[in-house]
Amino acid sequence: MLMKPLAASTAMLLALAANAQAEELTLCWAAWDPANALVELSKDFEAKSGHTMKFEFVPWPNFADRMLNELNSGGKLCDLMIGDSQWIGGAAENGHYVKLNDFFDANGISMDAFVPATVTGYSEWPKNTPNYWSLPAFGDVVGWTYRKDWFERPEIAAAFKEKYGRDLVAPATFAELKDIAEFFQGREIDGKVVYGASIYTERGSEGITMGVMDVLYSFGFKYDNPDKPYDMQGFVNSPGAVAGLEFYKALYDCCTAPGASNTYMGEGIDAYKSGQVALQMNFAFTWPGFEVDPNVGGGKTGYLVNPAGPNGERFAQLGGQGISVVSYSEKKDAALEYIKWFATPEVQANWWKAGGFSCLRAVVEDPGFASSQPYAQTFLDSMAIVKDFWAEPSYATLLQDTQKRFHDYVVAGNGTAQEALDGLVKDWTTNFEDEGKL
């Protein structure tokens, strides 16, 4: 266990806190299954601390707008915020979150105790510096599910092998994934026409950006020059990045269901559970629900790390969030008690059991973790290859530009991939020039 010893047991500290003024804390997050699990988990905190927890959960398509507006207005609705990874730069630089370094030091909470990618992704600003604004709360990453039961049907497996000359197994490359999607597109299974894949195409929030980036990374896309920050020409619009964007459009055109022009997490879940698609791109948070679903659970679903690109590179889009104390809260001490409780190994182990994706190394590096769920090893392997979108203070503008460029090309069919990425370089350059970074 990498957590530093606490001066006294968590139970004792929380009991002492209960003798102080009991507070009603509001935790803000997205409305999804992990949030419901956290409500149940938090009953332990209420019992031990004497504080009462309230929750404000907002559907994902509206989550960023609603909560960023709350932060930017200095609102006091939220005492605790589980905010998206890309918000960290703006929240830190604009004073929305409480810096947690002193609190961590005083309470024996070491960032070395957490998966490094989640510390960088959820907690640090500036990136790769020991300045912490959140505790890693929910690890998440884009991966794939596939209908393992369909793959194993002898007649389907034989038809695939006859056409492609290889066995129908989980794809190791994106080229293989596209072959499988094309094979299933329009095929009749159990009297129902099915389709190849569900991928992210949503325009209004972040959907198509998360999906396209998940593929582009493995084709060689880079946000900027590793040796010269914000130097994007030839990195964002490299030949590999262009090929990746062309691939994504080809996958959309060949192998998605009719009407899949505005698909994100919820639509992907519905398409997969209803037996509409053979392959589905989605964040790992969906996997516990699939595993217990009567239609696709109980061994019918396989879990897949993002496949490799044409040169063997393999990366995946980071999801997930850290938990922060909102600087405008009048109940910061009680909010910090919650973070202290949440950071303990016992609570983190229970978080995983409840359906949360713990970022604590003592949990995920436990010898029994990989076999604890059918998707656990895929989660570990995926978290080892993550990359993330910009986390700059101007994240929202950068994202809006990206959403438009990608949707216009992939879904609307306007222009070429080269033109879309050249335009994105222009958009992002203007943004960073306005910020004085170029």
Q: Where is each model-derived feature located?
A:
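Extracytoplasmic/periplasmic substrate-recognition and gating elements
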Residues: E23, K48, P126, P130, ...
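Extracytoplasmic "Venus flytrap"/periplasmic binding protein-like
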Residues: E24, E40-A117, G121, P154-E155, ...
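Extracytoplasmic "Venus flytrap"
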Residues: L25-E40, V58-P61, D140-V141, E206, ...
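Mature extracytoplasmic/periplasmic domains
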Residues: D44, G268-I269, F285-D293, G309, ...
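Hinge/lid segment of periplasmic solute-binding proteins
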Residues: S85-G143, I208-G211, K300-P307, G368-P374, ...
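Extracytoplasmic/periplasmic solute-binding protein
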Residues: E124-F138, V142, T173-Q233, V277
